[in-house]
């Protein structure tokens, strides 16, 4: 047990320690300063030349968003075409068939919005070609899209008064070539050393310990797993994600993959401080996020290592903790750490089944996604926190009788309205979606039965499974309580639309706020200025997040996870 706890502590320390220098490097990349990765410039110039892009051309916030949305729309069409025709394409040694239109729609939307809501199993639902040229490609593009959006916001808040927020295409390419690609190569090399397969052969026939013949899927897993983690996408190469012994073979590979989930989201907070020369602000934001993260880790590690009281009643020893749905080679503590790490970000990968975690652990996993501001996805995580900063600034200003300001710019009704819509959209789509699915389940059983039935676990846990699915979609996370039968018309289309709304409306709103504030006249700090880089304001922001985001979900948790906890 002590060894497992030490492993958890070591991983967290490594994340924090390495995020700081990486954040400094990221800020230099976006500022165009000299870095060790300047050898990539010829490749970047070639990309810009082939695509007809002038990387030095500045964009206003509307042009920036237009480029972002056009890029995503193009790749959505690309993905749809490839997924429904994948059985005709090369690199399909196992003869896997095409995806149905509704499943392809869900898959494309999911990966286009940097989610990994997989209503299919990777071994049989995709080919090597679509794994590489749809899934892996999307994992680079969508991660770089979020990072580019944050780079634009960092540029806007760093300038005193400006009508432009940088060039989307330039930030997109730099995010890919200077940050995501180098880190992916390092992680991929480590995974290959640990035993993750990298090749294009078909299924391998092996003889099990029982003497039975079994076919084991392989393929280019080591190329895809690094970016799935670093880009906070989380889409597993294999159906059971990083629980699979070939996707995550050893405790070392588990540490590296878990580290990869959080390193860039953490670094982006520090990058904000270095880019804007406001390190104290970055430290305050990082402190709030880290506090929430550590609280979640503590609760889940405690819950999972103490085991299941129902099993205790049977007189069965649980020295390893609550091991249902967990890998013996990893243990309960490492699985609990991963469950929080993957849900405070938009990653969604798993190294154990969240459906099998203790009820309060499941509640913490959902609350992380329902709050959706602790580190979050690469780029967009801080942007969600930025929304609540605007709300907190406005409320704080009203409370003390000062004009609401953030970084020398007045926060007025227009920005506040946008921030409010973005903040309320998240609980709205989750709760309305869950209400619709539970209504259909209770009052239209024939429809549910026609889709094969949805729930394997009725009662409190059945509600949790439906709530988790919509929560995961809205947070662009993609993990799931897999007792839910979700590869149906209802879940594919309902989740697809939630994914679209929850990805693009917040990005549009957050970039719009940054663009509107950037155009305003800069007001120098004075004795009457509300300081946003203090512990007091950090606590205020945390309180606003807790009240607006967390409390919206406590009634439904009282009927699901909390009720299930007290029923044990």
Predicted regions and their residues:
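N-terminal alpha-helical transmembrane segments of multi-pass membrane transport
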Residues: 1-106, 161-166, 170-207, 283, ...
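Membrane-helix cytosolic exit motif
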Residues: 22, 395, 437-441, 506-519, ...
């Amino acid at each position: 047990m002590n060894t497992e706890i030490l492993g958890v502590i070591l991983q967290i320390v490594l994340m924090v320690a390495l995020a700081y220098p990486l954040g400094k490097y990221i800020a230099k990349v976006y500022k165009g300063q000299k870095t060790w990765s300047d050898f990539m410039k010829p490749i970047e110039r070639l990309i810009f030349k082939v695509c007809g892009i002038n990387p030095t051309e500045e964009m206003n916030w509307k042009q920036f968003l237009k480029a972002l949305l056009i890029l995503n729309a193009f790749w959505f069409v690309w993905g749809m075409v490839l997924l429904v025709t994948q059985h005709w394409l090369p690199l399909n040694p196992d003869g896997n068939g095409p995806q149905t239109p509704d499943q392809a729609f869900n898959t494309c939307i999911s990966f286009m919005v940097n989610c990994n809501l997989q209503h299919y199993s990777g071994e049989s639902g995709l080919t090597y070609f679509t794994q590489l040229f749809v899934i892996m490609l999307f994992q680079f593009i969508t991660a770089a899209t979020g990072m580019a959006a944050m780079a634009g916001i960092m540029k806007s808040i760093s300038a005193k008064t400006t009508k432009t927020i940088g060039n989307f295409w330039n930030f997109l390419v730099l995010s890919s070539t200077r940050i995501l690609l180098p880190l992916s190569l390092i992680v991929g090399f480590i995974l290959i050393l640990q035993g993750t397969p990298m090749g294009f052969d078909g299924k391998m026939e092996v003889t099990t310990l029982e003497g039975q013949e079994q076919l084991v899927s392989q393929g280019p897993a080591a190329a895809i797993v690094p970016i799935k983690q670093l880009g906070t996408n989380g889409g597993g190469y294999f159906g059971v994600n990083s629980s699979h012994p070939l996707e995550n073979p050893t405790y070392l590979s588990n540490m590296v993959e878990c580290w990869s989930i959080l390193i860039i989201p953490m670094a982006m907070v520090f990058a904000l401080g270095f880019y804007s020369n406001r390190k104290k602000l970055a430290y305050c934001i990082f402190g709030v996020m880290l506090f929430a993260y550590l609280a979640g880790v503590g609760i889940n590690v405690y819950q999972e290592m103490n085991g299941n009281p129902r099993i205790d009643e049977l007189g069965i020893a649980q020295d390893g903790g609550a091991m249902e749905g967990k890998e013996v080679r990893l243990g309960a503590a490492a699985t609990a750490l991963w469950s929080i790490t993957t849900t405070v970000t938009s990653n969604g990968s798993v190294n154990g089944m969240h459906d099998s975690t203790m009820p309060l652990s499941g509640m913490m996993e959902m609350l992380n996604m329902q709050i959706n501001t602790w580190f979050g996805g690469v780029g967009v995580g801080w942007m969600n926190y930025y929304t609540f900063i605007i709300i907190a600034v406005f409320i704080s200003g009203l409370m003390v009788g000062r004009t609401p300001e953030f970084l020398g710019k007045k926060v007025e009704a227009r920005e506040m309205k946008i921030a409010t819509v973005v903040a309320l959209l998240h609980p709205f789509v989750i709760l309305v979606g869950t209400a619709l699915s539970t209504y259909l389940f209770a009052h239209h059983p024939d429809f549910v039965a026609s889709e094969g039935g949805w729930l394997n676990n009725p009662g409190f846990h059945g509600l949790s499974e439906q709530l988790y699915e919509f929560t995961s979609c809205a947070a662009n996370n993609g993990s799931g309580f897999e007792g839910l039968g979700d590869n149906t018309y209802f879940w594919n289309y309902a989740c697809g639309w939630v994914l679209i709304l929850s990805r693009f409306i917040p990005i549009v709103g957050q970039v719009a706020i940054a663009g509107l504030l950037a155009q305003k006249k800069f007001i120098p700090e004075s004795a009457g200025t509300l300081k946003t880089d203090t512990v007091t304001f950090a606590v205020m922001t945390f309180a606003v997040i807790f009240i607006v985001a967390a409390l919206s979900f406590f009634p439904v948790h009282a009927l699901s996870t909390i009720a299930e906890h007290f029923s044990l």
